[in-house]
């Protein structure tokens, strides 16, 4: 069976994924699938850096605003709904372009491992999500408990080994139906960090404080409230810290998150990054996409 061609734009927060995704969608007759765990939530627009209405008018976006704020969203939900979106886009004769920085979601969509049956697949992904939330120390402690020997530097192999130990022969390795062109965006670290700091300031100017206060007042304990951009402001609302300290914490957490994203994509998905500071970087990417789409 011929594989479905997908384009995936990945990289750290604030690097310019949204803008590139829209440009590629306009150039190659594509539609965008958001690969972000927070952008699924309605009414949370500023803190999630959701594509603006003007940007969404330039290219159709899937998996944005598909959950109420008080609903949970899992990697299983994403994979299931992303597959539907891919089929919908393909049926229109268009190119699916996945844009996002939630690495576990993208990896789970692209790879071929699965358990038989829909309920079992949900079980696998829930277990994987639980393992991913563990620290390195806790993860390798689980390996030790089960007498599994894995190099401590390799989280991916560790998680796969634990999945195999839990599910055994029920864990099947089928070929992925997707042929994916991974486009990784990166920038000089200090330039990226400066951009993150400026973006947080712009978010505050655009009403992030009010958006976070609404979430704090109405849904302080839901999954969505745990996201970066909201949880840092909650201590300010409860009068534990001044606003300046909360904003500084938000900037710091976002920078750390960007670093973790880069590490994930490098180590877990073998992404080769293109520096957005390079001259004509978008033209280079467009040539890669054109060659990919024209190949058999």
Curated annotation (Swiss-Prot):
Catalysed transformations (reactions): adenosine(37) in tRNA + dimethylallyl diphosphate = N(6)-dimethylallyladenosine(37) in tRNA + diphosphate
CC cofactor: Mg(2+)
Keyword Oxidoreductase: no
Alphabetically ordered keywords of this record: ATP-binding, Magnesium, Nucleotide-binding, Transferase, tRNA processing
Residue numbers spanned by region Interaction with substrate tRNA: 36-39
Annotated site (Interaction with substrate tRNA): 102, 128
Gene Ontology terms for molecular function: ATP binding; tRNA dimethylallyltransferase activity
Enzyme class: transferase
Gene Ontology biological process terms in this record: tRNA modification
Entry EC no(s): 2.5.1.75
Chain sites annotated for binding ATP: 11-18
Oligomer and partners: Monomer.
Family: Belongs to the IPP transferase family.
Protein's job: Catalyzes the transfer of a dimethylallyl group onto the adenine at position 37 in tRNAs that read codons beginning with uridine, leading to the formation of N6-(dimethylallyl)adenosine (i(6)A).
Protein known as: tRNA dimethylallyltransferase
């Amino acid at each position: 069976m011929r594989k479905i061609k997908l384009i995936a734009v990945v990289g750290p927060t604030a690097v310019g994924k949204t803008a590139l995704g829209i440009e590629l969608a306009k150039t190659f007759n594509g539609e965008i699938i958001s690969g972000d765990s927070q952008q699924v939530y309605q009414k949370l627009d500023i803190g999630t850096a959701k594509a603006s209405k003007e940007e969404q008018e330039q290219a159709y976006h899937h998996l944005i605003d598909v959950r109420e704020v008080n609903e949970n969203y899992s990697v299983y939900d994403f994979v299931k709904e992303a597959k539907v979106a891919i089929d919908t886009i393909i049926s229109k004769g268009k190119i699916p372009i996945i844009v996002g920085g939630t690495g576990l979601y993208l990896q789970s969509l692209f790879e071929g491992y699965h358990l038989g049956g829909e309920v079992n697949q949900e079980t696998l992904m829930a277990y994987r999500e639980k393992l991913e939330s563990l620290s390195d120390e806790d993860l390798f402690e689980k390996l030790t408990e089960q007498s599994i020997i894995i190099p401590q530097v390799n989280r991916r192999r560790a998680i796969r080994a634990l999945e195999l130990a839990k599910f055994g022969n029920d864990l099947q390795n089928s070929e992925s139906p997707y042929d994916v062109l991974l486009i990784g965006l990166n920038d000089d670290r200090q330039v990226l960090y400066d951009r993150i700091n400026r973006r947080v300031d712009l978010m505050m100017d655009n009403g992030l404080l009010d958006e976070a206060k609404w979430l704090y007042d109405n849904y302080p304990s839901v999954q969505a409230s745990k996201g970066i951009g909201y949880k840092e402001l909650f201590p300010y609302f409860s009068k534990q810290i001044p606003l300046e300290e909360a904003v500084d914490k938000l900037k710091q957490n976002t920078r750390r998150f960007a670093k973790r994203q880069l590490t994930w994509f490098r180590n877990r998905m073998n992404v080769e990054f293109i520096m957005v500071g390079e001259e004509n970087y978008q033209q280079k990417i467009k040539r890669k996409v054109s060659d990919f789409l024209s190949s058999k």
